[in-house]
Amino acid sequence: MNVLVDSDILIEVFRGRDAAIVDAWRALPSPSHALLCSPVSICELWHGVRPAEQNALEALFAALICVPVNAEIGRRAGDYLKRYSKSHSVEIVDGLIAATAAVHGAALWTRNRKHYPMRDFDFYHQPDLR
């Protein structure tokens, strides 16, 4: 199973503030679990990084497979926005991340499930490792 890691989880892993998320992150990479990210998440994290932290953030990105946004993802995200932007306040970034998960058959690892009312992909259920 591929796991698409949302920006909120990447921030927690980078900052190391949530031990449960960090433990789950360390347990995840395996031949059966590829860790994916969207360039949208890279943008969100890079925007807020301090210059002294850039190398550490690059190391985090190196542990991920960045899945490029293509036309299929763009169309799917556009469909999501047509359907959910007014009723659920879905924004473009969340539409693109959700579409990436759906197109690549990946489970989305996020704590912001309210941002993702779509039903054509699964969520990753973080195990309790404590």
PLM feature segments, named:
Residues M1-C37, W46-A62, R130:
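Short, well-structured N-terminal submotif of metal-dependent ribonuclease cores
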Residues M1-N2, A98-R130:
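Acidic, PIN/NYN-like endoribonuclease modules and their adjacent C-terminal/linker elements
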Residues D6-S7, L45, A77, A101:
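Generic structural signal for small/hydrophobic residues in well-ordered secondary structure
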Residues I9-L10, S41, I73, L96-I97, ...:
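Alpha-helix capping/helix-boundary segments
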Residues E12-V13, G48, A77, R119, ...:
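Residues that scaffold the ATP/ADP-binding catalytic core of kinase and kinase-like folds
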Residues P31-S32, A63-L64, H104, R119:
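Structured helix-beta-strand junction loops
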Residues L36, V67, Y124:
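General small-molecule cofactor/ligand-binding pocket signal
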Residues I65-R111:
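Active-site neighborhoods of divalent-metal-dependent phosphate/nucleic-acid chemistry enzymes
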